[in-house]
Amino acid sequence: MAENSVKKVVLAYSGGLDTSVILRWLQTERGAEVVTFTADLGQGEELEPARRKAEMFGVKEIFVEDLRETFVKDFVFPMFRANALYEGQYLLGTSIARPLIAQRQIEIAEAVGADAVAHGATGKGNDQVRFELAYYALKPDVKVVAPWREWSLTSRTKLLEFAEAHQIPIAKDKRGEAPFSVDANLLHSSSEGKILEDPAQAPDEIVYQRTISPEAAPDVVTEISIDFAQGDAVALNGVALSPATLLTRLNELGRDNGIGRLDLVENRFVGMKSRGVYETPGGTILLAAHRAIESITLDREAAHLKDSLMPRYAELIYNGFWFSPERRMLQALIDASQNSVTGRVRLKLYKGNVIVAGRESPNSLYSARMVTFEDDEGAYNQQDAAGFIKLNALRLRLGGAIGRRGGAL
């Protein structure tokens, strides 16, 4: 991209030091008109200071939006219908937030006549990929500015010097290197970098901001129930709640019971491994509950097929392919599987553990009469099992006979 080819750019703006430097850099080095977009995804920060700071920089068009309900309803819940876990552990809290931010940037760009969008992701991480794949999927001709890949501010010292030269306020705690970086939204909080870069060293308790330690959690069990309708959680303890309100309440319950901590070394899409410390209190509870209600409402082969597709689905989200045709195809299959996933799950929360205490559904496929160890009154003829076993053993018997004669597998 030519240095001054951008005329008007929509910046994903947090109001923090890094994106404030980016804002000023776009104005001074690129000569671009900047439109700021700040999204409330439940990160727990006051966002009006971002508006005031943008005004201080002379920004005329400022968007500060509460997207918590949209985030949970249209992004988090569809993902949880799949029980998505990246590399078997990560609940994708950062990954699932990027498509919504990118989508709103593009919508705003089209509304205000901007020819470009910009983000504050570095050139080493996954977020640059997630943002830009979404941008190009939604607006193929959009121009993208990624300052961390372009500018000469390659050190913290240079960043601070630029900030001071352009009268960008610097909080006292930003003048030194932060001990680790934090990204947060309503689903999770992630901490990476600096003191966490050695995977052999346990994270200090100061890293955890959304959960108390399991050791410090109450010595009494917290009992709750979650109601599901077609795969989505709709009520907590019998009280109907909006998606964001329900997840917020689950976060509080998880926090108080030391639930949802994860120390993970993951494989980034860009090729390197990274260590992250994640807190997903409400999501951890929700995942356990969703799997429990599926256990009685999904057909065996449907459940197994869904489980076999989950790693691919999770990988697509992690790598930034939310708006890809293959993710949409998988989502259609997953959503179809949830038509019968309705009912109630009872849980016990205790010192970092989520324990399923019961599950019930009007669509339950579980037959106590069929599986009983007592007299089933003819519900199941055990003699039928002999033919079932013989048919399934046929290929094994044939292979075994060849094997005894020295044949290959």
UniProtKB/Swiss-Prot annotation:
Catalytic reaction equation(s): L-citrulline + L-aspartate + ATP = 2-(N(omega)-L-arginino)succinate + AMP + diphosphate + H(+)
Subunit field text: Homotetramer.
PANTHER family given in the database record: ARGININOSUCCINATE SYNTHASE
Residue sites binding L-aspartate per the record: 122, 126-127
One Pfam family it belongs to: Arginosuc_syn_C
Locations listed in the record: Cytoplasm
UniProt GO MF annotations: argininosuccinate synthase activity; ATP binding
Documented EC number(s): 6.3.4.5
GO BP, sorted A to Z: argininosuccinate metabolic process; L-arginine biosynthetic process; urea cycle
Amino-acid positions noted as binding ATP in the UniProt annotation, renumbered to this chain: 12-20, 39, 120
Protein species of origin: Acidiphilium cryptum (strain JF-5)
First-level EC class: ligase
Annotated gene: argG
GO CC, alphabetical: cytoplasm
Classification lineage: Bacteria, Pseudomonadati, Pseudomonadota, Alphaproteobacteria, Acetobacterales
Alphabetical keyword list: Amino-acid biosynthesis, Arginine biosynthesis, ATP-binding, Cytoplasm, Ligase, Nucleotide-binding
Family: Belongs to the argininosuccinate synthase family. Type 1 subfamily.
Sites where the protein binds L-citrulline: 90, 95, 126, 130, 181, 190, 266, 278
Pathway: Amino-acid biosynthesis; L-arginine biosynthesis; L-arginine from L-ornithine and carbamoyl phosphate: step 2/3
Main subcellular localisation: cytoplasm
Chain ranges passing through the membrane: none
Protein name: Argininosuccinate synthase
